[in-house]
């Protein structure tokens, strides 16, 4: 008799229904096709839940399959002001997860962590083993702005690294720079929902009406429009050099600082249209003449492995990007440009491309799909 795959309790960093899914949601949804998953969303307080129309008892309406279970833990507000409240919230979180695990009859699950801040969950849930998924250089993120915050993150990450049976790292360079090598460490770069974004190539997929109204040619971006990641100055300067091109940014503005609206992007040919439902994104990307990854180059982004690269390529769209190390492996399928003048020139040049590289883009995306990546990860889990 084949042994049933071990259940997973995932301490997630994003809500499962977040309109801009990351590898956290993509990975767990696909693992739930083969094994049971308890997806523990970031804790919130009851006031937030009532305002958002969520069930204040900690349940959620998201139920993607019989194997995917979602818990929205409830904690007390003001933890950032009080160490006592923060400690109490940690106990509340553990208690709620334990209760749900008992209800689901999870026995010795895999504990899957996505942040060093989750170190306090280790050894509290009766887990058989810990899997740690490193997606970023966490100490370089906006939430670690002070030396004390960075020091805590480093210490917490050491705790997680020591406990983890498997460490999955999305950036090869991050693994090399941090010396994360050996049998426990697995470089698993980000990939894309190729089938979903490949829908942009199908004749029956119609361009979204608001994109058709903007008109082309369109240089487009999908993702969080935030100053810590997007080089607004470069984008604005490139847009001023190309008044004939519509620059369209699709996604929430100001994730790190929601009050931030980039004034430098208030240009007649720049359109910030806000987030759109994930299911409808192929109809938006279909309107792109060129796709953009205009990231700042800094301590955080130099280790980024953008999912959007393969999302764009799956739609057959040419890509212009700043010089992120992870993008260099795509070769001539991505045009690298590091200053406003060369970025504007690169976008114009991509507009003149014929479809000679389209199939190569699609083929590269197909080699970097979630279906392939899940096979790799499942093989690692089954060997242990």
Residue locations for each model-derived region?
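Conserved donor-binding/catalytic core segment of Leloir-type glycosyltransferases
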Residues: 210-229, 236, 366
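Glycosyltransferase donor-sugar binding loop
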Residues: 246-259
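Nucleotide-sugar-dependent
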Residues: 18-22, 279-284, 291-314, 321-331
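Membrane-proximal helix-turn-helix segments that form the acceptor-binding/catalytic region
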Residues: 27, 95-102, 123-124, 148-167
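A charged, aromatic-enriched C-terminal amphipathic alpha-helix characteristic of glycosyltransferases
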Residues: 352-381
């Amino acid at each position: 008799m084949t042994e049933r795959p071990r259940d997973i309790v995932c301490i997630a960093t994003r809500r499962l229904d977040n309109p801009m899914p990351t590898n956290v949601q993509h990975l767990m949804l696909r693992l739930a096709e083969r094994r049971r998953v308890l997806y523990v969303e970031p804790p919130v307080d009851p006031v937030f839940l009532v305002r958002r129309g969520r069930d204040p008892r900690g349940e959620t309406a998201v139920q993607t399959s019989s194997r995917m279970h979602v818990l929205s833990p409830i904690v007390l507000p003001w933890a950032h002001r009080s160490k006592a409240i923060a400690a109490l919230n940690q106990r509340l979180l553990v208690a709620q997860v334990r209760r749900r695990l008992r209800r689901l009859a999870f026995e010795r699950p895999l504990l899957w962590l996505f942040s060093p801040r989750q170190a306090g969950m280790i050894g509290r849930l009766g887990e058989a083993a810990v899997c740690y998924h490193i997606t970023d250089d966490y100490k370089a993120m906006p939430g670690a702005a002070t030396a004390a915050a960075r020091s805590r993150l480093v210490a917490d990450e050491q705790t997680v690294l020591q406990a983890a049976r498997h460490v999955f790292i999305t950036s090869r360079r991050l693994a090399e720079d941090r010396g994360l090598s050996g049998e426990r460490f697995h470089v698993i770069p980000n990939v894309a929902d190729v089938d979903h974004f490949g829908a942009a190539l199908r004749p029956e997929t119609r361009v979204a009406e608001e994109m058709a109204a903007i008109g082309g040619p369109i240089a487009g971006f999908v993702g969080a429009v935030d100053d810590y990641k997007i080089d607004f100055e470069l984008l604005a300067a490139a847009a001023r050099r190309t008044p004939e091109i519509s620059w369209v940014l699709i996604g929430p503005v100001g994730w790190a600082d929601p009050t931030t609206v980039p004034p430098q992007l208030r240009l007649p040919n720049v359109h910030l249209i806000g987030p759109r439902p994930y299911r409808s994104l192929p109809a938006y990307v279909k309107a792109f003449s060129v796709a953009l990854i205009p990231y700042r180059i800094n301590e955080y982004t130099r280790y980024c492995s953008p999912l959007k690269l393969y999302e764009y390529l799956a739609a057959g769209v040419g890509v212009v990007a700043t010089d992120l190390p992870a993008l260099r492996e795509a070769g001539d399928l991505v045009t690298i440009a590091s200053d406003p003048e060369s970025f504007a020139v690169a976008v114009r040049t991509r507009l003149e491309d014929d479809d000679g590289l389209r199939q190569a883009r699609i083929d590269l995306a197909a080699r970097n799909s979630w279906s392939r990546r899940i096979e790799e990860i499942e093989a690692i889990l089954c060997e242990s």
